[in-house]
Amino acid sequence: MSTLRELRLRRALKEQSMRYLLSIKKTLPRWKGALIGLFLICVATISGCASESKLPEPPMVSVDSSLMVEPNLTTEMLNVFSQ
């Protein structure tokens, strides 16, 4: 009689442990994904702060002064065509 009771108890404990393992397998990927996401956010934040990156300064553009003078070609053409 005691052997049957022990067998039933072992079987019940085995079923409980299997249910527990299945529930862990379902919840573990969620926790793992959340922890990996937090880790990546921390790494990105730390690397961004450590790089001390500055915005690039806009390049200084110089314009040739001859381009700023009104061209005389248009006025000459108007004079030629108007005559």
UniProtKB/Swiss-Prot annotation:
It is a lipid-anchor. GO terms for biological process: killing of cells of another organism; viral release from host cell. The keyword Isomerase does not apply. InterPro entries: O-spanin_T7likevirus. Keywords: Cytolysis, Host cell lysis by virus, Host cell outer membrane, Host membrane, Lipoprotein, Membrane, Signal, Viral release from host cell. One of its GO terms (cellular component) is host cell plasma membrane. It is found in: Host cell outer membrane. The keyword Membrane applies. It comes from the Viruses. Residues 1-50 form the signal peptide. Homodimer. Interacts (via C-terminus) with the spanin inner membrane subunit (via C-terminus). Part of the spanin complex which spans the entire periplasmic space. The spanin complex is composed of spanin inner membrane subunit and spanin outer membrane subunit. Component of the spanin complex that disrupts the host outer membrane and participates in cell lysis during virus exit. The spanin complex conducts the final step in host lysis by disrupting the outer membrane after holin and endolysin action have permeabilized the inner membrane and degraded the host peptidoglycans. Host outer membrane disruption is possibly due to local fusion between the inner and outer membrane performed by the spanin complex. Belongs to the T7likevirus o-spanin family. This is Spanin, outer lipoprotein subunit.
